[in-house]
Amino acid sequence: MRFNQYSYINFPKENVLSELKKCGFDLQNTANHKDSLETFLRRFFFTYQDTNYPLSILAADKKTDLLTFFQSEDELTADIFYTVAFQLLGFSYLVDFEDSDVFRKETGFPIIYGDLIENLYQLLNTRTKKGNTLIDQLVSDGLIPEDNDYHYFNGKSLATFSNQDVIREVVYVESRVDTDQKGLSDLVKVSIIRPRFDGKIPAIMTASPYHQGTNDKASDKALYKMEGELEVKLPHKIELEKPQLNLVQPQGKAELIAEAEEKLTHINSSYTLNDYFLPRGFANLYVSGVGTKDSTGFMTNGDYQQIEAYKNVIDWLNGRCRAFTDHTRQRQVKADWSNGKVATTGLSYLGTMSNGLATTGVDGLEVIIAEAGISSWYNYYRENGLVTSPGGYPGEDFDSLAELTYSRNLLASDYIRGNEAHQADLEKVKAQLDRKTGDYNQFWHDRNYLLNAHKVKAEVVFTHGSQDWNVKPLHVYQMFHALPTHIHKHLFFHNGAHVYMNNWQSIDFRESINALLTKKLLGQETDFQLPTVIWQDNTAPQTWLSLDNFGGQENCETFSLGQEEQAIQNQYPDKDFERYGKTYQTFNTELYQGKANQITINLPVTKDLHLNGRAQLNLRIKSSTNKGLLSAQLLEFGQKKYLQPYPAILSARTIDNGRYHMLENLCELPFRPEAQRVVTKGYLNLQNRNDLLLVEDITADEWMDVQFELQPTIYKLKEGDTLRLVLYTTDFEITIRDNTDYHLTVDLAQSMLTLPC
């Protein structure tokens, strides 16, 4: 384990003593260190009637137990302090470590022995081997009462609200959209779990079209075969109009009553970060949105109608929209328990909705935590004039996603009454998304949140993985740079795939978000501020560093690609084409081994480099015909240890999100040997070689100069490493699978790779 502590806040000594005293650690600033440590530990072991026993089973050094040490005349030393501290954090002395000074350096332990009271205070705010901070572990065990009131420690809310005796209710928010054109505003179901509290509390809202269930069967039927010919497009410039949003006004009157009438029972799945905040005094709201089970309207996937309906839930929390008790719209309830302050959470589609909500500038949305969210839907299902699939899901497109999330069809009566209209709406979607050309058009323009990034007022926290080929890193990169300069923005850029990171051992992500939300939503005045970029170092396990920016580098490193012309044959023998189509993983493996139709260029790294931003290929290229698809991957090549893209379980159900509440696994990205690691990749239709909005002819056998930016990333390379650039046509995981007989030729002498460093 390595410690990477970003959540700790330096407080004045008087605050430290006061907070310790409130938790029963009655330490005196004038006492000697040894006495203070003993006082601290006897309170620490509050679950024991006889505190001599736990002291007797801890060690002060290799010869002395802690009780014997306290009974001796020996002085407290730094070595003894560290030895005791590591044991309190769950490490076994003489098993996990023998020399505390060596272990302190190996783990990056954040505490430097000196002022013992401040050391002990920081120790309580340090994560244990099993994932909780020490103070959270003690509170979970009953250190302070579960009194349904707020208690703070180091600028973070503690788990002092009951997670058993909570209010569970359902309301139906009246949106300002009418997606199915029935003349009535769509209703959106809101599932609420909130702690009991006499005052007003903030809300954690997860906007998830998956929450009410998914129609996997219908979605699978809507998948496309990726086999087909790359379209030869007529040259033209793409014209667009400013997206429009038509809102509807509330209709009719509804009796105001005191409480919701529908009780929330089980929910399909909660998000463990929300679970963590519930006993800390934050309401949990799960909203599926229009076109989902128990709501009304069509599934408009990603447009501002869908976003508006989610926004209206925040409006309700602030008294600007109504919520009914049921679909009759006869009775309404107010969110009189809400303080009006909201944060959004969730990954993938959920993080996408956070991005979209932020761009509305809605009052009350204080923070978004957008994890692996889409910033422009075109870049999810298309790339540079190509029809593409999200990584791992070949054949998926917008209409199959609409079928997946239109969970109203899971209700038989809704299916009978509404499926015909839903299918008619879906046919319009199929026509608009244009799988023929892969071009950007008005349909995608209406789902581009970057156009409204200037409206963002909330503080923004992103998480994204360098190995996320589902929602590719371009999404967070573009959103990060599109935000207004005065907005506080933060990015956790890890080396995983399309995954959550709130239960990783190596970083105090949950506690950092706690510090932020306690400040922004509960009004605690602290100077807590996350760094702009928190980056997971790819060269070592469990190592995180603070950076000033994502991209924007002034310096570049250029690699020449060779001295000759090389060709990429597009067509495969039928047997190989079929084999790769059945299992794209086989294609990826053989591509990395140099066995596919490809140009492979090994580039020695002659000095340490820190890639930060978008690698760019400058290629002189020609096609043997009037079309061309170019794929590129940049690898670090060579057998060595790399971080793996998916977290592994270190210990099962050891993280307590409250008081024995929603226990979850402690995880981490493994660091183990592999033959290569993908650094970045990209795909380009050569007819869109100069601009996404400009389609140009390709003249057979005529040279073209192409500038081709790959996916943004942050990656460290060391002198002696090897980069491998792979250029090819069809990618059997991502692109259309065109097996026509043509080839691309690259003049390597007139081509180069540029890395921003």
UniProtKB/Swiss-Prot annotation:
Domain of life: Bacteria
Any Pfam family hit: PepX_N
Catalysis performed (reactions): Hydrolyzes Xaa-Pro-|- bonds to release unblocked, N-terminal dipeptides from substrates including Ala-Pro-|-p-nitroanilide and (sequentially) Tyr-Pro-|-Phe-Pro-|-Gly-Pro-|-Ile
Annotated compartments: Cytoplasm
GO annotations of cellular component type: cytoplasm
Annotated active site: S348 (charge relay system), D468 (charge relay system), H498 (charge relay system)
Enzyme superclass (EC): hydrolase
EC numbers, comma separated: 3.4.14.11
GO molecular function, one term: aminopeptidase activity
Primary subcellular site in the record, as a coarse category: cytoplasm
Matching Gene3D superfamilies: 1.10.246.70, alpha/beta hydrolase (3.40.50.1820), Galactose-binding domain-like (2.60.120.260)
Sorted UniProt keywords: Aminopeptidase, Cytoplasm, Hydrolase, Protease, Serine protease
Family stated for the protein in its record: Belongs to the peptidase S15 family.
Subunit structure: Homodimer.
Its job: Removes N-terminal dipeptides sequentially from polypeptides having unsubstituted N-termini provided that the penultimate residue is proline.
Record protein name field: Xaa-Pro dipeptidyl-peptidase
